Regions:
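Short alpha-helical segment of the dimerization/phosphotransfer core of two-component systems
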Residues: 1-6
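Helix-loop junction within the histidine kinase core
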Residues: 17-28
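A conserved beta-strand-to-alpha-helix junction within the catalytic ATP-binding
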Residues: 27-45, 54, 77
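Short helix-loop "hinge" at the ATP-lid/N-box region of the Bergerat-fold HATPase_c
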Residues: 87-88
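Short conserved segment of the HATPase_c
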Residues: 124-138
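Short alpha-helical Gxxx[C/S/T] motif in the catalytic ATP-binding
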Residues: 148, 153, 157
Length: 186
């Protein structure tokens, strides 16, 4: 368990350093949104199964009006993985994580995608929510040890959302769960 935690911590630190060092270029490439979502969700479903957490994907490929998009699929995948990994990590066995994607036309050239992730995990206190996106922030030592958290997941997500020109919102209640909504233009 300790080696898994250390590996996760090192990977998160490397990810954050990489994001800090990279000069984000907004070179857009064409990509298939369904492929990105399926990859992220397949990997998370495996993690959730190992932990006995239900992982519900609340969309079908047919629900996606705009599948072929232009943007940065690598950063999108990193964003969705960071948020859904956190949800699985902080949800106790027997709990549930639900992810979704909704789309709407922003204008003649852009599509707004709303990616959501909700869990019935441990949640956060009202006082802590303001610090949730800070690097290495954790509500208490129990989070760090019991859930093997590094306090980087949401700070990584916020950094990537900024690169993608989107916004991220967080709602949480201690003992009830957390919902993260990311709106990204493509």
């Amino acid at each position: 368990e300790s080696s898994k935690y250390l590996l996760s911590l090192v990977n998160n630190i490397l990810e954050m350093n990489k994001l800090e060092a990279e000069e984000y270029t907004d070179k857009e490439i064409s990509f298939n949104l369904a492929d990105v979502l399926n990859q992220v969700n397949t990997d998370r479903q495996i993690l959730a199964e190992k932990k006995n957490v239900s992982y519900i994907v609340d969309w079908e490929n047919s629900d996606l009006t705009y599948v072929n998009l232009s943007g940065n699929p690598v950063y999108l995948e990193r964003l969705l993985a960071a948020v859904s990994d956190n949800a699985v990590k902080f949800t106790n066995p027997g709990g549930c994580v639900k992810v979704w994607c909704k789309q709407k036309k922003a204008d003649n050239e852009h599509v707004l995608c709303e990616f959501g992730c909700a869990d019935n995990g441990i949640g956060m206190s009202e006082e802590f929510i303001g610090h949730a996106f800070e690097m290495f922030s954790q509500e208490n030592q129990t989070s760090r040890t019991q859930y093997e958290g590094s306090g980087l997941g949401l700070s990584i997500a916020k950094k990537i959302v900024g690169y993608l020109g989107g916004k991220i919102e967080l709602e949480s209640r201690k003992g009830v769960g957390t919902t993260v909504i990311m709106t990204v233009p493509f």
